[in-house]
Amino acid sequence: MNAAVLIDPARLTDASTRVQREPFPFVIATGQLPADARAALREDFPRYSGAGFFPYAAEDCGPSVNRLVEELTARPFADALGEQLGIPGLSAYPTLVTICRSLNKRHGTIHTDSKSKVATALVYLNESWPDTSDGCFRFLNRIDDIDDLAAPEIKPLYGAIAAFKRADNSFHGHLPYEGERRVIQVAWLTSEEEKARKTQRGKLSRLFKKLFGGIDRKLGAGRDRNAAHRD
């Protein structure tokens, strides 16, 4: 892999990107990562012992993933995304990066995200995906129906991005899925205090999952497809 830019804001704003304002502002884009970066990003992706999202730490990742995180949190990408979402100066907000390598069936219940988030971007890095809707990201019209889609579902394939402006009706989620599902999540937050609080909570969650991951997996195994929580 050469030193070329991994995430080019110009690609995000080309004609193939889907931008929607209703029922809330969101963006769907594919092909956002270069093909020649696949191998490095695969090798450099963090290896977590538990399932779910964990706070980004540079020491967990190899150089290409660290570079990608740096570019995703830099002003050019943030402001290009903010323009698409109707959020001027998105880069002015503090960022929180979390990374997921695998899920259990508890994850993906319908929710809006908390009010401490201004916007969220999910960048997928899976080189293939089964012929199933399980684990495919969905923007939704309502909180109680995973099948009431606001746009076509998004397979979490390499280079796909799903991003949205947080709102009281920014419902999203996916059908239960267990297994590897690589994704980097960038959240722009309302304050540094919220970033510190969420980071600390994420570290505690990582410890809990390391100690009690088997229980977490069993509790989520039978979750309802329309399971939801507000944030």
Q: Locations of the language-model features?
A:
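Conserved short histidine dyad/triad with adjacent acidic residue
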Residues: 99-113
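Short, conserved, surface-exposed binding loops centered on an aromatic residue
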Residues: 91, 110-114, 129
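Catalytic core of Fe(II)/2-oxoglutarate
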Residues: 115, 133-231
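A short coil-to-beta-strand element that immediately follows conserved catalytic motifs
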Residues: 88-98, 133
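Short helix-loop capping/hinge motifs at secondary-structure junctions, enriched
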Residues: 35, 130-131
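Active-site rim elements
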Residues: 64-70, 107-108, 149-151, 171-172
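Acidic, metal-ligating active-site segments
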Residues: 119-127
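Non-heme Fe(II)/2-oxoglutarate
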Residues: 3-87
